[in-house]
Amino acid sequence: MSQTEEKKGIGRRVQAFGSFLSSMIMPNIGAFIAWGFIAAIFIDNGWLPNKDLATLAGPMITYLIPLLIAFSGGRLIYDLRGGIIAATATMGVIVALPDTPMLLGAMIMGPLVGWLMKKTDQLIQPRTPQGFEMLFNNFSAGILGFIMTIAGFKILAPLMKFIMHILSVAVEALVHAHLLPLVSILVEPAKIVFLNNAINHGVFTPLGADQAAKAGQSILYTIESNPGPGLGILLAYMIFGKGTAKTTSYGAGIIHFLGGIHEIYFPYVLMRPLLFIAVILGGMTGVATYQATGFGFKSPASPGSFIVYCLNAPRGEFLHMLLGVFLAALVSFVVAALIMKFTREPKQDLEAATAQMENTKGKKSSVASKLVSSDKNVNTEENASGNVSETSSSDDDPEALLDNYNTEDVDAHNYNNINHVIFACDAGMGSSAMGASMLRNKFKKAGINDITVTNTAINQLPKDAQLVITQKKLTDRAIKQTPNAIHISVDNFLNSPRYEELLNNLKKDDQA
């Protein structure tokens, strides 16, 4: 394996880890928001103080949210059974440290117990006497839950207390030294290579929850989610950009600023690498502004939309919120404008920049691909048949795997029995939902009413999936998850010629 391939492999593993963390946190964002509303509205200094209703906030962040995260983590590993025992075992960590929201402990305990439950069943079920299945299943789960609850209380809880103390001290040191804005030097570039999931959901969310529980709000929720820096970049392209980049920047600005899907501005930065300076300085400005004004959110601002920022802003601090977003956008815009005005026009176009971002991330961007409408198709496979060694090596070679499944030749498949199409992306939320909505509209206009179109995360694809649509760099993961499905790769998730080809094939099969 070459050094370049090894680096790509490491990068993909890191991104997959970030995706897994995101899959535990993102489905529970609604619970975070509900808790945030209760805390913001009913506490003593809230919008509508109510002592009785305010008592809901404590148990929700102490018990409900960690248990939901643990359940999600266990379920990702071993379905419902893994989730239930994971949530049970996490009570040990929660009860041992009742004054600290155990989000980080839940993120560890959930997948761990789910994996142990899976291995326990694999060991016990083949050896279970006939007629004793229910007894063995229930008691094996109960005994594992009992053991891991005690282990959580006695072993993991002290470890979590130490880790949370170290992280909290580090954050407090940065805050007191007025150095927290420097975190943007790492966070803003990390967003471009899709490490923001690991940073935001793995570090900022649990630490922010701890701070919010103690102080009522946390600045950590604003570090990665501020839409200002990205807006500044897109505004600069609206005014100083040329060609495709300029014309697409308007729609991208709406999707980014109001929709909260930040990845749509990443290709614009990659077109001119000097623009990394603009997003870093914009991010630092936003953090510095919020630090100076003492601003913070009570719950995660997810997605990082201006609308979410407005809804989450604490009472009496709406102007502080606006100031942080405005100044971040202003600094990012000014720096980007200077760079675009006084540096050479890049040879790289928007499509190439999108491809570079996707290659750097090790996956296709499901929303950024709206920016380009390329009709590129790979060359027809010259050698359709391969030997056994080539097939076995395809697991390590994504391109070979895609060739084996004819993922870019829509006409190569039989669609007679298709009644469900799934859009799959990394997190399974915003971008895949947009793609699914677009295809549903196409089906409706074409009179195809008997095919369901849904969206999900790659690692939650059902084993009986029939037709899966993914971005090209994600397709190899989707194939490994659902090897019996038809897989279609697209270069442009929201604007691909393959959708028309799919519609034509579905109509033909329907008429036949």
Curated annotation (Swiss-Prot):
Residues 355-402 are annotated as: Disordered. The chain crosses the membrane at residues 29-50, 55-75, 140-161, 171-191, 279-298, 319-340. Keywords: Cell membrane, Kinase, Membrane, Phosphoprotein, Phosphotransferase system, Sugar transport, Transferase, Transmembrane, Transmembrane helix, Transport. InterPro entries: PTS_EIIB-like_sf (IPR036095), PTS_EIIB_2 (IPR013011), PTS_EIIB_2/3 (IPR003501), PTS_EIIB_mannitol (IPR029503), PTS_EIIC (IPR003352), PTS_EIIC_2 (IPR013014), PTS_IIC_mtl (IPR004718), Sugar_PTS (IPR050893). It catalyses: D-mannitol(out) + N(pros)-phospho-L-histidyl-[protein] = D-mannitol 1-phosphate(in) + L-histidyl-[protein]. The active site is at C425 (phosphocysteine intermediate). Residues 51-54, 162-170, 299-318 are extracellular. It is a multi-pass membrane protein. Residues 419-512 form the PTS EIIB type-2 domain. Pfam families: PTS_EIIC (PF02378), PTS_IIB (PF02302). It is found in: Cell membrane. It is an enzyme of class 2 (transferase). The phosphoenolpyruvate-dependent sugar phosphotransferase system (sugar PTS), a major carbohydrate active transport system, catalyzes the phosphorylation of incoming sugar substrates concomitantly with their translocation across the cell membrane. The enzyme II CmtAB PTS system is involved in D-mannitol transport. The EIIC type-2 domain forms the PTS system translocation channel and contains the specific substrate-binding site. The PTS EIIB type-2 domain is phosphorylated by phospho-EIIA on a cysteinyl residue. Then, it transfers the phosphoryl group to the sugar substrate concomitantly with the sugar uptake processed by the PTS EIIC type-2 domain. This is PTS system mannitol-specific EIICB component. It comes from Staphylococcus aureus (strain COL). The gene is mtlA.
